[in-house]
Swiss-Prot record:
It holds the Pfam family G3P_acyltransf. SMART domains: G3P_acyltransf (SM01207). This is Glycerol-3-phosphate acyltransferase. Keywords: Cell inner membrane, Cell membrane, Lipid biosynthesis, Lipid metabolism, Membrane, Phospholipid biosynthesis, Phospholipid metabolism, Transferase, Transmembrane, Transmembrane helix. It comes from Burkholderia thailandensis (strain ATCC 700388 / DSM 13276 / CCUG 48851 / CIP 106301 / E264). HAMAP family: PlsY (MF_01043). It comes from the Bacteria. Its main location: membrane.
Length: 202
């Protein structure tokens, strides 16, 4: 019962869309109404408000970290509990019950989850994102590369462990890549927006 409650709680935590909440609190346009229509930090940045984008990034990462940390801290369900919390908070961000199941792509939330699973895993994945984003200026490309490398880092740090947490990392990476399928098409067509590019309603 504890595992079930923790999993539901993690999903509800993930369902809090900081892009929408922060934008509303600051009197800004709903990020689902412009740019990529994605309620995430990158699209909020396209709206031209760096403070809102930073708050969104921190909030989305924090909720991912919090959901997993709580399960680990209280020892709920061991590795199975951690894995379920990780997937649940991630799915909550992707399909939030509070926002008609229309959520973001999960990059910041996944980073928070990985930091809670193990700081080295989270930092290595975040650093990969930063390097690709810095040199290529594509948030989506950075996210895709980081998603590919997250399971690789997991194996490098912990070996070929056959446990629920490792499978949760793989599942999140696969879901993140799938959520970026439209971005992949735009990248291949040379139509993807770069980091910091202003919003358009088209």
């Amino acid at each position: 019962m504890q595992i079930l409650l923790a999993t539901v709680a993690a999903y509800l935590i993930g369902s809090v869309s900081f892009a929408v909440v922060v934008s509303a609190a600051m009197g800004l346009a709903d990020p689902r109404s412009y740019g990529s229509k994605n309620p995430g930090a990158t699209n909020v940045l396209r709206g031209g408000n760096k403070k809102a984008a930073i708050l969104t990034l921190v909030g989305d990462a924090f909720k991912g970290w919090l959901a997993v940390w709580l399960v680990k801290h209280f020892g709920i369900g061991g590795e199975i509990g951690v894995a379920l919390a990780a997937i649940a908070v991630f799915l909550g961000h992707l399909y939030p019950v509070f926002f008609r199941f229309q959520g973001g792509k999960g990059v910041a939330t996944a980073a928070g989850v990985l930091l809670a699973v193990h700081p080295a895993l989270g930092l290595a994945t975040a650093l990969t994102w930063l390097i690709i984003a810095f040199f290529f200026r594509y948030s989506s490309l950075a996210a895709l590369v980081a998603a590919v490398f997250a399971p690789v880092f997991d194996v490098f740090l912990f070996g070929t462990r056959n446990n629920p947490v490792a499978w949760a990392v793989i599942a999140m990476s696969a879901l993140l890549i799938w959520r970026h399928r439209s971005n992949i098409s735009k990248l291949l067509a040379g139509e993807e927006s770069r980091i910091g590019q202003k919003k358009t309603d088209a």
